[in-house]
């Protein structure tokens, strides 16, 4: 699996937002204790090529989990894995 840079991100725009610096992810989850974003090569992939684990100290504001990931590009396939 590839390593990704996980920056703080912006909690104010929910969803996946393309920016000049990468893709910003923001999702509401009141009960989450752990959030991962898994990235896939294509629709048939069974395992992710990269996983970004969000740090609650820098990637959580209230009930919003957020991250800016510079390596992610438009059209990337992803899913959230949330514990809690």
Predicted regions and their residues:
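Non-catalytic, glycine-rich low-complexity segments
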Residues: 1-33
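Aromatic- and glycine-rich beta-strand/loop motifs that create alpha-glucan
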Residues: 30-75, 83-84
